């Protein structure tokens, strides 16, 4: 099935990659997903799963100008019950690299129907992002979650124009250190 390259004035360059195109970009090394499972590839997205590590902030009152420390823990085999009014930091099982496209992480509809939000505002990645994804998890009511459950989906947009500085080469990039654990806010590193 082909899509008209000019839909409603939008250039084909502003479109989301299809399943076939995602596979082509993986073959070229422009997109890396580890581990990659073919059955997780959707029509125009790739399903990602909740890793085994969660964290919560030590303080109930967070301060944007200071380093807010977190306490990490593993999700037990019997699952973990999320509570409303608590921000949990989670992490994807999948490590990803994106060298030519803008990745967006969105929750799966089945996750949303359980009342779970997987990101507060940080759904967009940058070209050159090479890491697992930290999730900002909250819930509408108590809900039990499990390591390995499908939690979100990555979609990829084509970038128009040449990239001057990839995220993984930016001197001031705050989330470049590879990790399999959630990473707390680094807002305190900004000058304001």
Question: What name fits each language-model region?
Answer:
Residues 2-192:
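DUTPase catalytic domain/fold
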């Amino acid at each position: 099935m082909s899509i008209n390259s000019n839909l409603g004035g939008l250039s084909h360059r502003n479109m989301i990659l299809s399943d076939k195109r995602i596979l082509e970009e993986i073959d070229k090394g422009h997109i890396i997903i580890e581990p990659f499972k073919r059955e997780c590839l959707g029509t125009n997205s790739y399903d990602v799963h909740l890793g085994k590590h969660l964290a919560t902030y030590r303080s109930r009152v967070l301060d944007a100008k200071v380093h807010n420390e977190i306490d990490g823990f593993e999700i037990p085999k019997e699952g973990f019950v999320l509570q409303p009014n608590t921000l949990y930091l989670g992490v994807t099982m999948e490590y990803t690299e994106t060298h030519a496209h803008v990745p967006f992480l969105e929750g799966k509809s089945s996750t949303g129907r359980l009342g779970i939000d997987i990101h507060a505002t940080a759904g967009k990645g940058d070209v050159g992002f090479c890491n697992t994804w930290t999730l900002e998890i909250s819930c509408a009511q108590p809900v039990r979650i499990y390591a390995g459950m499908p939690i979100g989906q990555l979609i990829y947009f084509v970038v128009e124009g040449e990239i001057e500085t990839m995220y993984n080469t930016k001197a001031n990039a705050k989330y470049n250190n590879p990790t399999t654990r959630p990473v707390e806010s680094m807002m305190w590193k900004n000058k304001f």
